[in-house]
Amino acid sequence: MKILSVENLSRAFGGIKANNNISFEVEEGTILGVIGPNGAGKSTLFDLITGYTKANAGKVKFFDKDIFGLTPDKISNLGIGRTFQKLKPFADQTLLENVMIGSFVKEGNIKKARDKALEIIDFVDLIEKRHHFARELSTGQRKRLEMARAMAIEPKLLLMDEVTGGVDQKTIPGLVELIKKLKKSGVTIVTINIILILLWRFQIIF
């Protein structure tokens, strides 16, 4: 079953075409890799799909629902999660509080949100850091936090932007294993990440 369909998606900034008639489909339960040189519009593509930037033209469907033009919160509520290349945690809140923001939106109950957040934090192997402020975490730990925050909405589809970018070589294998575990849990993944693409050799788009 197709979980995501993108058709002729385009966005220009002035005279610069960031994305020009991009079309692709993602099957549920798979991983799709997006590759291209710096400045090719890969992150912008994620912004267009998730509503953070408005497209000039095109169609985006999540399963059979048209999500083109919807706001990020509505797209998120449908089950599309997103991580960012530039990490955006709430620096003065704890790891637990960061994840609870998303889980509370999903659960609507403080206790359930806390329990769900702790479950996710344990999943990303940060349970011992749950009471640490986000600003105290290493880059690799903040990458895991970014994934945990995206997982808090229980996404069916997760768009991952350079999840291993900016970390040292020793940290990368652990992040790769975490992504493997995430896929096994049933989440469909679209990733901008050359390391994962080389390791797994899954379907790619340019």
What are these regions (language model features)?
Residues 35-37:
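The feature captures the beta-strand-to-loop junction immediately N-terminal to the Walker
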Residues 158-161:
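Catalytic Walker B motif of ABC-type/P-loop ATPase nucleotide-binding domains
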Residues 133-137:
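Conserved ABC ATPase signature
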Residues 58-65, 78:
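Conserved ABC transporter NBD signature motif
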Residues 154:
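Conserved catalytic motifs of ABC-family nucleotide-binding domains
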Residues 112-129, 177-180:
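Conserved ABC ATPase "signature" region
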